[in-house]
Design a protein with these regions (language model features):
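Catalytic domains of cell-wall/extracellular-matrix polysaccharide-remodeling enzymes
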Residues: 118-209, 215, 227-249, 256
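C-terminal segment of N-terminal export signals and the immediately downstream linker at the start
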Residues: 21-42
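Short, well-ordered coil/turn segments that N-cap beta-strands
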Residues: 41-43, 65-67, 88-90, 133-136, ...
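N-terminal secretory signal peptides and thylakoid transit peptides that target proteins
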Residues: 1-22, 26
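Substrate-binding cleft of extracellular glycoside hydrolase catalytic domains
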Residues: 88-134
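Active-site beta->alpha N-cap acidic-glycine motif
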Residues: 36-104
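A generic structural motif
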Residues: 71-72, 97, 247-259
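Hydrophobic faces of well-ordered beta-strands that scaffold small-molecule active sites
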Residues: 43-47, 67-69, 92-94, 167-169, ...
């Protein structure tokens, strides 16, 4: 699959057919626990699907805010971008491909599938982590089907935990078992609140960023996930010019993770 097709498929996937089990609106936001009023709210923004284009990744490096980049394994620029992004002071995660409900969407190389046995799951996780050795955590790429498979997600998270990595459930399914399983394994973990760019319309992305800000104020912190689109960069730039955002700092994902 070429880079353009990959990015287009990723965008369309998030636009509805990804879930297969829930309404489109529930893909956008997930409510967390009410925040402690004595804690200052924070926003952590993850940029997914990194690894297929140098320019698309680099456009985020000059935003002058802490960002976390989730890098796909076995992509043309996986290793190069992991090093470059880390050198800029940003955090790096492994973007672990997992099976979606819609079989027309290819999660890409190094993916995990329903029915995979423990040996295959552990082997793939080991190989993918070795592809992104600077990773401090993992989140799922696609995975609306795989994250609903209790045995398989348990094996995957156990393998991730053995490397002392945290896990962020991207919540591509409202029935995902990933976060609950991670908690039972006593892993450092959390889950996505808002996908900011399921639509590439800049005004819609800006609206999602404001939604992310509201989540942070209400729950103490919020985790957003975006993708390497030019529209996403421009919307973030516009969002940062809003004086009302200055009281809610962007932080790296590690700053909001908890056990």
């Amino acid at each position: 699959m070429n880079r353009r097709d990959f990015l287009c498929k990723s965008a369309y996937l998030f636009a509805g057919s990804l879930l297969g089990v829930d309404s489109f609106s529930k893909a956008f936001a997930f409510e967390g626990k009410r925040r402690n009023p004595f804690l200052n709210p924070k926003i952590a923004l993850i940029i997914d699907d990194i690894g297929y284009s140098l320019p698309r990744a680099r456009q985020f490096l000059n935003l002058n805010i802490p960002l976390t980049f989730s890098i796909l394994p076995r992509a043309p620029y996986t290793r190069d971008l992991a090093v470059e992004i880390s050198d800029y002071g940003h955090e790096v995660m492994l973007h672990q491909p997992m099976q979606p409900y819609d079989s027309s969407f290819d999660p890409g190389p190094g993916a995990l599938y329903e029915g995979d046995d423990s040996s295959r799951i552990r082997g793939i996780i080991e190989e993918n982590i070795s592809e992104v050795p600077l990773a401090i955590g993992v989140n799922n790429h696609m995975g609306s089907r795989f994250t609903e498979c209790q045995e398989e997600i348990h094996e995957a998270l156990t393998a991730i935990k053995s490397h002392n990595l945290f896990f962020v459930d991207s919540r591509t399914s409202s029935h995902s078992k990933a976060f609950g399983t991670a908690k039972r394994l006593h892993m450092t973990s959390d889950r996505r609140n808002v996908f900011i760019d399921t639509s590439r319309d800049e005004s819609t992305i800006l609206s999602r960023l404001n939604q992310l800000k509201r989540c942070a104020r209400e729950y103490g912190h919020a985790i957003g996930i975006g993708h390497p689109f030019p529209e996403t960069v421009r919307a973030i730039e516009y969002f940062l010019k809003n004086p009302g955002v200055s009281d809610i700092p962007f932080v790296h994902i590690s700053k909001v993770m908890h056990t």
